[in-house]
Amino acid sequence: MDYYDIDSILSENQKVPCTSTVSIPGLGHEGRMVPTGSKVELPFWLAEVLAINSFVSIHMPAPFSSVVRNALKANPNSVSIRDITTHYYHFAEKMLHLISDDSLVQISLNTLRSRAMLIADASLNPQGALQQNSQFIEGLDDFEKHILRVSHNAHRSLINWQNSTS
Protein backbone atom coordinates (compact mmCIF):
# COMPACT_ATOMS: atom_id res chain seq x y z
CA MET A 1 0.00 0.00 0.00
CA ASP A 2 1.23 3.46 -0.86
CA TYR A 3 1.07 5.20 2.52
CA TYR A 4 -0.02 8.60 1.19
CA ASP A 5 -2.22 7.50 -1.72
CA ILE A 6 -5.88 7.73 -0.70
CA ASP A 7 -6.99 5.59 -3.67
CA SER A 8 -4.63 2.83 -2.59
CA ILE A 9 -5.88 3.03 0.99
CA LEU A 10 -9.52 2.88 -0.09
CA SER A 11 -8.98 0.04 -2.56
CA GLU A 12 -7.15 -2.02 0.07
CA ASN A 13 -10.07 -1.62 2.48
CA GLN A 14 -12.42 -3.51 0.13
CA LYS A 15 -13.81 -6.65 1.74
CA VAL A 16 -12.57 -9.98 0.40
CA PRO A 17 -14.24 -13.34 1.15
CA CYS A 18 -11.81 -15.79 2.74
CA THR A 19 -11.80 -19.23 4.31
CA SER A 20 -9.48 -19.80 7.26
CA THR A 21 -7.09 -22.70 6.72
CA VAL A 22 -6.00 -22.72 10.39
CA SER A 23 -7.52 -21.52 13.66
CA ILE A 24 -6.67 -17.84 14.06
CA PRO A 25 -6.76 -16.52 17.63
CA GLY A 26 -7.95 -12.95 18.18
CA LEU A 27 -9.32 -12.38 14.66
CA GLY A 28 -12.99 -13.03 15.45
CA HIS A 29 -15.60 -10.73 16.96
CA GLU A 30 -14.35 -9.18 20.23
CA GLY A 31 -11.03 -11.01 19.94
CA ARG A 32 -12.48 -14.49 19.68
CA MET A 33 -10.81 -17.30 17.76
CA VAL A 34 -11.74 -17.97 14.14
CA PRO A 35 -11.87 -21.77 13.73
CA THR A 36 -10.42 -23.64 10.77
CA GLY A 37 -12.74 -23.64 7.76
CA SER A 38 -14.63 -20.51 8.80
CA LYS A 39 -15.79 -18.19 6.04
CA VAL A 40 -14.96 -14.57 6.85
CA GLU A 41 -14.85 -11.26 4.99
CA LEU A 42 -11.67 -9.33 5.66
CA PRO A 43 -10.29 -6.06 4.36
CA PHE A 44 -7.91 -6.75 1.49
CA TRP A 45 -4.83 -5.46 3.35
CA LEU A 46 -5.37 -8.04 6.12
CA ALA A 47 -6.47 -10.87 3.82
CA GLU A 48 -3.34 -10.35 1.71
CA VAL A 49 -0.99 -10.79 4.68
CA LEU A 50 -2.90 -13.80 5.98
CA ALA A 51 -3.04 -15.43 2.53
CA ILE A 52 0.69 -14.96 1.94
CA ASN A 53 1.30 -16.74 5.26
CA SER A 54 -1.24 -19.48 4.34
CA PHE A 55 -3.66 -18.66 7.19
CA VAL A 56 -6.56 -18.04 4.79
CA SER A 57 -7.49 -18.81 1.21
CA ILE A 58 -8.93 -15.89 -0.73
CA HIS A 59 -12.03 -16.19 -2.92
CA MET A 60 -12.97 -13.84 -5.73
CA PRO A 61 -14.84 -10.81 -4.33
CA ALA A 62 -18.19 -9.60 -5.70
CA PRO A 63 -16.74 -6.84 -7.95
CA PHE A 64 -15.08 -9.59 -10.02
CA SER A 65 -17.91 -12.15 -9.95
CA SER A 66 -19.03 -13.98 -13.08
CA VAL A 67 -22.12 -11.74 -13.31
CA VAL A 68 -19.98 -8.59 -13.41
CA ARG A 69 -17.47 -10.18 -15.78
CA ASN A 70 -20.21 -11.22 -18.20
CA ALA A 71 -21.72 -7.73 -18.14
CA LEU A 72 -18.30 -6.19 -18.84
CA LYS A 73 -17.66 -8.67 -21.66
CA ALA A 74 -21.03 -7.93 -23.25
CA ASN A 75 -20.83 -4.12 -23.19
CA PRO A 76 -18.36 -2.42 -20.85
CA ASN A 77 -19.75 1.02 -21.69
CA SER A 78 -23.18 0.19 -20.29
CA VAL A 79 -21.91 -0.95 -16.88
CA SER A 80 -21.81 1.55 -14.02
CA ILE A 81 -18.48 0.52 -12.52
CA ARG A 82 -18.91 3.02 -9.69
CA ASP A 83 -21.95 1.02 -8.50
CA ILE A 84 -19.77 -2.10 -8.37
CA THR A 85 -16.87 -0.46 -6.53
CA THR A 86 -15.44 3.04 -6.59
CA HIS A 87 -11.88 1.75 -7.11
CA TYR A 88 -12.40 -1.08 -9.60
CA TYR A 89 -9.05 -0.89 -11.42
CA HIS A 90 -6.95 -0.31 -8.28
CA PHE A 91 -8.70 -3.21 -6.57
CA ALA A 92 -8.26 -5.47 -9.62
CA GLU A 93 -4.56 -4.64 -9.68
CA LYS A 94 -4.22 -5.53 -5.99
CA MET A 95 -6.17 -8.78 -6.40
CA LEU A 96 -4.08 -9.82 -9.39
CA HIS A 97 -0.94 -9.65 -7.26
CA LEU A 98 -2.44 -12.46 -5.17
CA ILE A 99 -4.59 -14.44 -7.57
CA SER A 100 -3.47 -15.36 -11.06
CA ASP A 101 -6.49 -14.84 -13.30
CA ASP A 102 -5.86 -14.18 -17.00
CA SER A 103 -9.57 -13.71 -17.61
CA LEU A 104 -9.76 -10.83 -15.10
CA VAL A 105 -6.69 -9.23 -16.69
CA GLN A 106 -8.23 -9.35 -20.17
CA ILE A 107 -11.65 -8.17 -19.04
CA SER A 108 -10.17 -5.24 -17.09
CA LEU A 109 -7.92 -4.20 -19.98
CA ASN A 110 -10.70 -4.49 -22.56
CA THR A 111 -13.07 -2.57 -20.29
CA LEU A 112 -10.60 0.28 -19.85
CA ARG A 113 -9.78 0.37 -23.57
CA SER A 114 -13.43 0.51 -24.55
CA ARG A 115 -14.40 3.08 -21.93
CA ALA A 116 -11.31 5.23 -22.64
CA MET A 117 -12.76 6.25 -26.00
CA LEU A 118 -15.94 7.59 -24.40
CA ILE A 119 -13.92 9.21 -21.61
CA ALA A 120 -11.70 10.97 -24.17
CA ASP A 121 -14.76 12.12 -26.09
CA ALA A 122 -16.34 13.46 -22.89
CA SER A 123 -13.14 15.31 -21.97
CA LEU A 124 -13.15 17.21 -25.28
CA ASN A 125 -16.76 18.32 -24.95
CA PRO A 126 -17.75 18.18 -21.27
CA GLN A 127 -21.10 20.00 -21.63
CA GLY A 128 -22.22 17.83 -24.54
CA ALA A 129 -20.99 14.70 -22.78
CA LEU A 130 -22.94 15.53 -19.65
CA GLN A 131 -26.11 16.02 -21.66
CA GLN A 132 -25.70 12.91 -23.81
CA ASN A 133 -23.86 10.50 -21.49
CA SER A 134 -24.61 11.65 -17.95
CA GLN A 135 -25.31 8.08 -16.85
CA PHE A 136 -21.96 6.90 -18.24
CA ILE A 137 -20.05 9.78 -16.59
CA GLU A 138 -21.73 9.10 -13.23
CA GLY A 139 -20.74 5.42 -13.52
CA LEU A 140 -17.01 6.09 -13.86
CA ASP A 141 -14.80 4.76 -11.10
CA ASP A 142 -12.23 7.07 -9.47
CA PHE A 143 -9.40 6.10 -11.85
CA GLU A 144 -11.58 6.80 -14.88
CA LYS A 145 -12.66 10.14 -13.39
CA HIS A 146 -8.99 11.00 -12.93
CA ILE A 147 -8.35 10.20 -16.61
CA LEU A 148 -11.33 12.40 -17.56
CA ARG A 149 -9.98 15.34 -15.51
CA VAL A 150 -6.40 15.00 -16.78
CA SER A 151 -7.56 14.70 -20.39
CA HIS A 152 -9.91 17.68 -20.07
CA ASN A 153 -7.18 19.82 -18.46
CA ALA A 154 -4.68 18.82 -21.17
CA HIS A 155 -7.19 19.76 -23.88
CA ARG A 156 -7.85 23.14 -22.21
CA SER A 157 -4.10 23.77 -21.90
CA LEU A 158 -3.62 22.95 -25.59
CA ILE A 159 -6.37 25.38 -26.61
CA ASN A 160 -4.90 28.10 -24.36
CA TRP A 161 -1.44 27.51 -25.85
CA GLN A 162 -2.79 27.62 -29.42
CA ASN A 163 -4.64 30.86 -28.69
CA SER A 164 -1.56 32.44 -27.11
CA THR A 165 0.69 31.63 -30.09
CA SER A 166 -1.78 32.96 -32.70
UniProtKB/Swiss-Prot annotation:
A Pfam family this protein belongs to?
A: Sld5
- Please indicate which superkingdom the organism of origin belongs to: Eukaryota
Q: Which GO terms describe its biological process?
A: DNA replication initiation; mitotic DNA replication initiation
Cross-referenced Gene3D superfamilies, in alphabetical order? Answer: 1.20.58.2050
Q: Which UniProt keywords apply?
A: Cytoplasm, DNA replication, Nucleus
Where, per UniProt, does this protein localize? Cytoplasm; Nucleus
Question: What cellular component terms from Gene Ontology apply here?
Answer: chromatin; cytoplasm; GINS complex; nuclear replication fork; nucleus
What this protein is reported to do is described as: The GINS complex plays an essential role in the initiation of DNA replication.
Q: Which family does it belong to?
A: Belongs to the GINS3/PSF3 family.
Q: Subunit arrangement?
A: Component of the GINS complex which is a heterotetramer of sld5, psf1, psf2 and psf3.
Q: What is this protein called?
A: DNA replication complex GINS protein psf3
Q: Which organism is it from?
A: Schizosaccharomyces pombe (strain 972 / ATCC 24843)
